[in-house]
Amino acid sequence: MNPENWLLLRRVVRFGDTDAAGVMHFHQLFRWCHEAWEESLEQYGLTPAEIFPGSRKSEVTPEVALPIIHCQADFRRPIHSGDALAMELRPERLNPNSFQVHFEFRCEEQIAAHALIRHLAINAKTRHRCALPEGIDRWLEASGVGKIGSI
């Protein structure tokens, strides 16, 4: 299985993603990041029911929640309706209970934006830190970034 299949994704900017000036509104970038992360997990072979509480076809609520504890973005150039974007995801395990994903958005081979989203694994009932879910562990390992880093 080639990680490029789930770490390099594409999307076209839609009219509804832009503001009155026809430029992507800043908050859309984080929505795209989360959607790209979800798509990456699905392309890898994980179902939404394995990761996200409340998913359709989920017979059991996942024991682990993955709230976002930090996010940041840098915008390098305007993104317009109709632009074709290449989105590269670079997941990084930080420790046994957290990871982050770096996102790079390219348009016409130029970097349009960078973003980072950091997740923490917590027990869905107690809300205390816990180990990452097995599926996320597998996704991180298969993405070639299974090493432990510093937060």
UniProtKB/Swiss-Prot annotation:
The keyword tRNA-binding does not apply. Belongs to the 4-hydroxybenzoyl-CoA thioesterase family. DHNA-CoA hydrolase subfamily. One of its GO terms (molecular function) is 1,4-dihydroxy-2-naphthoyl-CoA thioesterase activity. Pfam families: 4HBT_2. Catalyzes the hydrolysis of 1,4-dihydroxy-2-naphthoyl-CoA (DHNA-CoA) to 1,4-dihydroxy-2-naphthoate (DHNA), a reaction involved in phylloquinone (vitamin K1) biosynthesis. Its EC number is 3.1.2.28. The active site is at residue 19. The keyword Hydrolase applies. Pathway: Cofactor biosynthesis; phylloquinone biosynthesis; Quinol/quinone metabolism; 1,4-dihydroxy-2-naphthoate biosynthesis; 1,4-dihydroxy-2-naphthoate from chorismate: step 7/7. GO terms for biological process: phylloquinone biosynthetic process. It comes from Prochlorococcus marinus (strain MIT 9303). Keywords: Hydrolase. This is 1,4-dihydroxy-2-naphthoyl-CoA hydrolase. It catalyses: 1,4-dihydroxy-2-naphthoyl-CoA + H2O = 1,4-dihydroxy-2-naphthoate + CoA + H(+).
